A protein has these predicted regions:
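Conserved functional acidic sites
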Residues: 1-223
């Protein structure tokens, strides 16, 4: 969204968590409202904006509850987002097709250690290379087409996911993250997939299991 106090964006948030031994995929749906609530000027003289995310049940009249506070830092070099205490370099300049940068250079190793990932791209996010795609092209999200948008492919890596059935003895993983921003609007779509499939130990009756998460954000409304 444009960075100005009082601006907001409302998203459909679909969150899927993959759990260990129950092999249960749990989908939770929310409305998420990102609201620009204040700003400050940091030591280098760049402006940082405080964005509060509110969540509401996806159905019925929205009842907003503050969930997290994030910070967007805008400079002449980049736009950084600190989300859940992780700082991402979301946009870099110049904004041209094929331009790449290390968007996770501030991210420590294994930031999602609670999941127990072992796939290298799920552990070492600093190895990701962000790439601009489809600069100034139309993009459709939430039933609306935006005339000028840009997609950032942050990572697209996989192991053994193209076979129709994962063999019990095979390790598999998926690491994918892309975001699309529309001109004068901001983030309109985010798709995040990080999971490992762990095969069962040999000569046991224990089943294999998937660990990780999938999150999509789709813009519904903004001011």
């Amino acid at each position: 969204m444009p960075l100005q106090v009082g601006r907001y964006a409302i998203y459909q948030l679909d969150s899927t968590n993959f759990y260990h031994y129950g092999q249960l995929d749990t989908l939770t749906q929310y409305l998420a409202k990102d609201s620009v609530e204040s700003f400050f000027v940091d030591t280098p003289g760049d402006t940082s904006w405080v964005v509060v995310r509110y969540l509401s049940p996806a159905t019925g009249t929205p009842v907003w509850t503050a969930n997290e506070t994030n910070v967007v830092n805008a400079s002449s070099r980049s736009v950084d987002l600190t989300e859940n205490n992780l700082r991402f370099i979301k946009l870099a300049y110049p904004m041209q097709n094929g331009i790449t940068w290390s968007g996770n250079s501030y991210i420590p190793d294994d930031p999602y250690d609670s999941y127990g990932f072992t796939a290298p791209k799920n552990v070492n996010l600093s190895d990701w290379t962000y790439t601009y795609q489809n600069v100034n092209q139309p993009f459709t999200a939430g039933g609306k087409t935006y005339d000028s948008a840009v997609t950032i492919l942050q990572v697209d890596d996989s192991s053994n996911v193209n076979i129709s059935i994962i063999v019990d003895t095979s390790f598999a993983s998926r690491t994918y993250w892309s975001e699309t921003y529309a001109k004068d609007v901001g983030l309109v779509y985010r798709n995040t997939i990080l999971w490992d499939y762990q095969p069962p130990p040999p000569q046991t009756t224990q089943s294999g299991y998937k660990i990780g998460f999938k999150i999509t954000l789709t813009l519904l409304d903004h001011n």
